[in-house]
Amino acid sequence: MKTTIHYLLRAFLLIGALFCLQTVEAKTENHSFTVGKGTFLLDGKPFVVKAAEVHYPRIPRAYWEHRIRMCKALGMNTLCLYVFWNIHEQREGEFDFSGNQDVAAFCRLAQKHGMYVIVRPGPYVCAEWEMGGLPWWLLKKKDIRLRERDDYFMQRVATFEHRVAEQLEPLSIAHGGPIIMVQVENEYGSYGEDKPYVSAVRDMLRKEWGDKVTLFQCDWASNFTNNALGDLVWTMNFGTGANIDQQFHRLGELRPDAPKMCSEYWSGWFDKWGARHETRPAKAMVDGINETLSKGISFSLYMTHGGTSFGHWAGANSPGFKPDVTSYDYDAPINEYGQPTQKYWQLREVMQHYADGKLPAVPKAPMPFIETPEISLAEYAPLSNGFGNTRSSDRPLTFEDMDMGWGTMVYTTTLPELPGKVALAMDAHDYAQVYLDGKYVGKTDRSLDEKSLMLPAVKNGTQLKIVVEGMGRINFGRAIKDYKGIVGDVTLTTDQGVWTPRQWTCTTLPDDYATATKALANSTTTDGGKASAPGYYRGYFKLSKVGDTFLNMEAFGKGQVYVNGHALGRFWHIGPQQTLYLPGCWLKKGRNEVVVLDVVGPKDGAKVQCLNHPVIDKLNLEKPVKHNDPKMALPKGKLKIALSTTLKPGNGWQTIRLKEPLRGRYIALQIGENQNGKSQTAIAELYAQDEHGKRINRDNWQVRYADSEQGNHTLDKAFDLQESTYWQTDAKATLPHVIIIDTGKSQTISALEYLPRQEQGAPGSARQVDVLIFGGE
């Protein structure tokens, strides 16, 4: 009898399991995300994507759920996220999808709260992230061609995309998961034109994700057609205040029945070391989202919550070298530490109008904010305690040559007698300090384009030591192939000639916590209040309760911080960021450890303090960077105007074609009149064309002169590869306005390409312009 009952029970359970399986399969089959006429379709019904861009590595895992709930309460129905290759494969072939890298867990949390997910798996992501998400170890292959059909690069991309799909493809909507769209590459039009490469990435993703996922590619309105693939959804990226109709005009011509989506609507902007904190008006952002939704256009708000580029993950911008700060606050609706801003509350009011029901309540912060008294860091160890591998070479070796991704390299060599003044020249990536027999004699800072310094007369046998700290690798444009350390030779020039050292000792100094701990194992006690030497510093503080806080680093110089083993990120006394966000989930009751690696040494003693508020807008520059030196202005009456022209009003690119190609190094524009009759002038982007009508590379362009610059709207914004940023004069500055750009060398120029600001009406756009090409022969 028992046997009969046992079999009946098993049969009943089996039938029940089959019934449940069929139900799940039927439910899964009914879930789809597709493209309809003028709209996206979710399960066959019109669906407007209202996405919040958030990045899981920039948020402590303990706070993921809070940030997701904040996005939900804002009125968003989707999360948009990059998958960062270099955080998952920090060493070739060694993948990590655990802990704060568990992107699948992040997506499951989104689904738990009723949100869909858009996945952007690169391989390149930009995001003001180290090397745009590409792993540094790719550069160990010197001839590699990044973001092209280089065999080795494509093999590694294929492996990465396979591993990502293993984690995330089971979470696609076809399987009942939250993932509705997957992006192919990222803004490739701003990098180049290579449809075969973009097609190859698409094919990889199609192979890994199947044909039931919607693939799309994003670009700018000015370049999306260069790499547009016929079987992909096309989306546009643009920023606060942009003329939305103009941004989608070309797409509407080519695909009148396609759904419209702004895949990156930039809520603010990122900060760079040595420049003012960036902000964008709340009203302009909110009005833009309102207009977008009123027209049934989908969007992803980049960023809704920026978070923090912890550790060494902050990138750098180009042309030139402009390293990003640790904070990725982005002036977003949800600030760096998870609190709603005025942008949040204003946007929430608008989003409520487009919601099906009442929005969820805004969740409380997961922790209170705390502060502490000043903390003295009394333990000290010299930089040499952290030395790693050493190699001898006939040339300076880069980080990549030494198999080091991040940190500092120390180069030493012995000099012969060099009488008189000595000019040392080198291309150091990124911040180099120079010593003669242990005495500091100067520095070069790549962010200031410094490549040389003068040395005193050198005696025979003098030791030359160069300490080079690497900052974030460039994350945007062609300069992403960014080696660290000394790139090329070091030369020393005297009246008697040029000498190039050929006997170098190169020593690594990694910037990880393990190295810091090793260094401090042989520490000494110092007077923290008077400390000034480069090296490692450690101190402790006790807490009776934990909470979020901000570690004030103003007393220190330049380097990295670790609290209880967690890498908070880079600090630099020049600002604008002076505090580092310290999540309360990384603290504990009782004793907490602070370790500081300072490569230049404290400025005001070895001390820190936990504050209950951030300081991210305080500059401490030796001298302000200005470009209105009269010595750099146009020589009066000595130059011939190449062209006087009248520009058209309105948004969009215009070509200014010279009467004949001219050769020169400098491009000067003299603006005599603006379209609106006012004196304030603005330019979003400028390009030059060579004699064949091709765009001239701008990587070496620099500002020579600008008669006026308003705040962060400096002239370099006119050639920073970003169409949403711009040069703008002060409102009180009078016409005519003059700008001069140094292209780096003499070359033939046949035309200029000019882009006014993207906002409706193109505010500050020029009307009457004189063009001059001169110098460099």
Name the predicted role of every residue range.
Residues F153-L229:
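Active-site neighborhood of glycoside hydrolase catalytic domains
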Residues L568, M632-K638, L647-E777:
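Aromatic, loop-rich ligand-recognition surfaces of beta-strand-rich domains
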Residues G93-Q101, K112, P123-R147, V198-R202, ...:
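Aromatic- and acidic-residue-enriched segments that line the glycan-binding/catalytic groove
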Residues K421-Y435, L464, F541-N564, F571-W572, ...:
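Aromatic-lined ligand-binding clefts that engage carbohydrates, nucleic acids, or primary amines
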Residues E208, G241-N335, Q339:
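Catalytic-core region of carbohydrate-active enzymes that cleave or remodel glycosidic bonds
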Residues I466-G472, V596-P602, Q670-G677:
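Short beta-strand-plus-loop segments that form exposed binding edges in beta-rich domains
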Residues W64-E130, R202-G210:
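Aromatic-lined substrate-binding rim segments of carbohydrate-active enzymes
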Residues A26-T78, R108:
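N-terminal carbohydrate-binding accessory modules
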